[in-house]
Every structure is written in C-alpha cells, then in structure tokens.
C-alpha cells in the first residue's frame, strides 16, 4: 500500500482499492466503512473524501484493512485543478436529497404528535434525531438545505416540548428592564400550581429578596390570572423566560440581584434543572429533595415553606468562599 504524508495544502483524499474477488466478506466490510465515512465513489474502487479534520485516520484504517486482505491500495492526497473542479468535487457531497427525504418523514411524524403519548413522543424524537445526526456526520459542506432541516428540527422539538410540558414558558426575545423594588411591595404574585424547580425558586426569591410581604396565587389555568396579579413563569407573564434565561434569572436581572454571588450561582443551578446546560454539582440533590417534598406535602404553600429552608441553605452555601 502506498500512502502519502499529510499536507496542509491538500484539499482532498483519494483512496483507490482493488480487492480480490474471493474476499467477499472484506469487500462488504470495506463498503460499509466507506459509506459510514461519507466518501463518494468516483468510479469502481476510487473513493473521494475532503481532507477535513477527523477523516484521514479512519480512511487510513480502511486502507490498511483492505491491504491486509491482499488488496491493492493507494491512498493519495490530491488537489482540484481549478475552482470549477473544486465546485464539482463539493457537489458530490451535497446532502440536499438526504435532508429533503428526512424532512418529509419529519413532516409526516409531526402530523401525528397530538395523538401520541409521552413514551411515543420520546421514541419519535430519538428516531428522527438519529436520522439527522447521521446526515450531519457526512455533511461536510452545510448549505441552505441543512439550514432548513435544522430549523424544521428545532420546530419539531419545540412542538414535542409543548406537548410534554403544557404550560411551560418558552423564551422570547427582548431586553430585561430594571425594576424599582419599592413599586413591588405587598403585591399578589401568581404562577402555575404544583410548583417545580423554577417556580418554587422564583417564589422563594420574591419572598426573600424582593417582596417580603408577598402573597401567592397558585393557578390551575394561567388564563385565570387576575389582572392586578404579577404573573411569573408562564407565557405572557410579567416575569418569564427571556432569551436563554429562565424566570429565576429574569427576576435576578430585573431587580438588580444578579451581582449577588450566591444568587447568581443558585441561578445557574435552577437554569440547568429547568432547561439544561453546564452541570451543577448540587442540582441533582436539590431536585431529589424537591421531588420528595412535593410527594409528601399537601399543597404548594407548605411546599414553598419547606423548600424555602433548603434554598436558604443553598444560598448560604453558594455565597460562602469556603469549600468543604
């Protein structure tokens, strides 16, 4: 087997292979490997790949495997003769057809989402996620087709999120105006009942740092929120997700509390539990305590009272410079 050294100026990798006719198993193994890499056949036994990071080594492995089966193998570093040939090479790797077929399947699946239970929704998301991941892996030159597919995939996941978490707020674009805390004293605050991470943390923050005399209304239907109540953590609420910030983080920024080290770190924990992100060590423990308390306690008032002590302790922990 002949192999040329890597060159930073080389744009393409060409693998030429001739396997013995008797090596049917090796031939099938080689073909599967070439297909998985996303190489394109210029003709029988001649396969082209762009010389991009991460592609040379697996192509070299296929070449070595073919040579071990008494195949004749040449791995070459080549360049396009001119811009036209470069464009022709790139066109060989256009994945528009694959994306179009995947989007047709996704569109068909979306039409059935409302009739699916939670388990089926998750299965559908995983199946189509694997589909787009497989195309992404071999899409070396993303274009408008890939952008359309990514947009449709985001919309599809958003539709599933709405079905899995009815009432959950969705981030909207916009700035977070600074609020005067003196104008928010002794107010009634409202959010969805059956408190979970973001809502219970918001209620604690309101009572502890914003409005000590706040009263809370736990809504069965957010459409019944009184006009004079300050809604939080639902779509259309006064305080809800903005951009990539969850409601707790929006409250911090609104009332100038985001410079508090302990609250900022607590916000990171709430964020990862609510929408994901960089792991926070304390997150899983808080989630477990909250889940147990919600099962054990009779209502949201009792839940806020008890979990408030936990959040007090976490705030102290996050504020302390000492690490135990």
Swiss-Prot record:
The keyword NAD does not apply. It comes from the Bacteria. InterPro entries: ChrB_C (IPR018634), ChrB_N (IPR046858). Induction: By chromate; induction increases when cells are grown in the presence of high sulfate concentrations (3 mM SO4(2-)). Keywords: Chromate resistance, Plasmid. Disulfide bonds: none annotated. One of its GO terms (biological process) is response to chromate. Pfam families: ChrB_C (PF09828), ChrB_N (PF20229). Together with ChrA1, this protein reduces chromate accumulation and is essential for chromate resistance, possibly as a regulatory protein. This is Protein ChrB.
